[in-house]
Every structure is written in C-alpha cells, then in structure tokens.
Amino acid sequence: MKRTYQPSVTKRKRTHGFRARMATKNGRAVLARRRAKGRHRLCP
C-alpha cells in the first residue's frame, strides 16, 4: 500500500509557502497569528 505522504518541494511551496499565504486574506491572517504567537518560522 502506498503511503499518503509523498513529499514534493514544489507542491509544498505552492500550497503552504509564504507567497501562497500572502495571496489570500485568510492566509495573511494565518501569518499575523503566527507572528503574534512569536513563531520563528511563519511558513514551512
């Protein structure tokens, strides 16, 4: 059986990257929350 997680840098960046987050209002909210919490890494 194939595992569910098949890593790909491209897909990761496109779905969870900084520019993907900045593209939507909700994505910007995510970044704001993570900044407020004091995360060193805002996006993977």
From Swiss-Prot:
It comes from Alkalilimnicola ehrlichii (strain ATCC BAA-1101 / DSM 17681 / MLHE-1). This is Large ribosomal subunit protein bL34. The keyword Disulfide bond does not apply. It comes from the Bacteria. Belongs to the bacterial ribosomal protein bL34 family. It holds the Pfam family Ribosomal_L34. One of its GO terms (biological process) is translation. One of its GO terms (molecular function) is structural constituent of ribosome. HAMAP family: Ribosomal_bL34. NCBIfam families: rpmH_bact (TIGR01030). The gene is rpmH. Keywords: Ribonucleoprotein, Ribosomal protein. GO terms for cellular component: ribonucleoprotein complex; ribosome.
